[in-house]
Design a protein with these regions (language model features):
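Acidic interaction surfaces
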Residues: 1-108
Length: 108
């Protein structure tokens, strides 16, 4: 991937926007953090932990598409959601959690 085409370090605008919302919306942040903690506490291989978080994110995204969006708007919303690189987001969340957890352990 050409690093010049990244949006603030992420694959695309949709992925970057999703990460912003995860970081700034308490409910979304807490749900994602719970998924990350669960994967981390299972002592899974890194790839399996990231896959588990990615699965959670994909389910979350698609479960929250409201049925009142129909036709054109639903198609546009689903298309944008499908552009989100959930693997990249899961990896980002996991690495941030591990980094913060290690910092907490050092200061405790």
């Amino acid at each position: 991937m050409d690093k010049n085409n990244l949006v603030n370090g992420f694959t695309n605008y949709e992925t970057f926007t999703f990460v912003l919302w995860l970081d700034n919306d308490k409910k979304m942040h807490d749900l994602a953090l719970d998924a990350v903690k669960t994967a981390y506490n299972k002592n899974l291989r890194l790839s399996n932990a990231i896959y588990e978080i990615q699965s959670f994110l994909e389910t979350y995204l698609h479960q929250n598409i409201h049925d009142n969006f129909t036709d054109f708007y639903r198609d546009m919303i689903v298309n944008s959601i499908n552009k989100i690189n959930t693997y990249e987001v899961a990896k980002h969340l996991f690495h941030n959690y591990v980094e913060n957890y290690q910092i907490e352990q050092k200061t405790a």
